[in-house]
Amino acid sequence: MCGDQSDHVLQHWTVDISIDEHEGLTRAKARLRWREKELVGVGLARLNPADRNVPEIGDELSVARALSDLGKRMLKVSTHDIEAVTHQPARLLY
């Protein structure tokens, strides 16, 4: 029966995000740990000298880029895992 609680599995994965800023460069790291593996995505944002300094925008942009990088890295892991199981080339789209 579809929706039966006996076939329902709930998992929680947590991404830890750290942000540091130095001399107009903001760097974010998005770290995911699961199944004894760890992936880290990195994102950078640089303050344009002509722009007003609004640190929150640099934080948002660097975090968005770090999460995007993490997603791409996760797809590479998934591709490798699929190929290991199927023994066929896999191509996953982002």
From Swiss-Prot:
Similarity remark: To M.tuberculosis Rv2632c.
Protein induction: A member of the dormancy regulon. Induced in response to reduced oxygen tension (hypoxia), low levels of nitric oxide (NO) and carbon monoxide (CO). It is hoped that this regulon will give insight into the latent, or dormant phase of infection. Induced in C57BL/6 mouse lungs 3 weeks after low dose aerosol infection with H37Rv bacteria.
Pfam families recorded: Rv2632c-like
Organism of derivation: Mycobacterium tuberculosis (strain ATCC 25618 / H37Rv)
Miscellaneous note of the record: Was identified as a high-confidence drug target.
Organism ancestry: Bacteria, Bacillati, Actinomycetota, Actinomycetes, Mycobacteriales
Record's protein name: Uncharacterized protein Rv1738
A single GO cellular-component term on record: cytosol
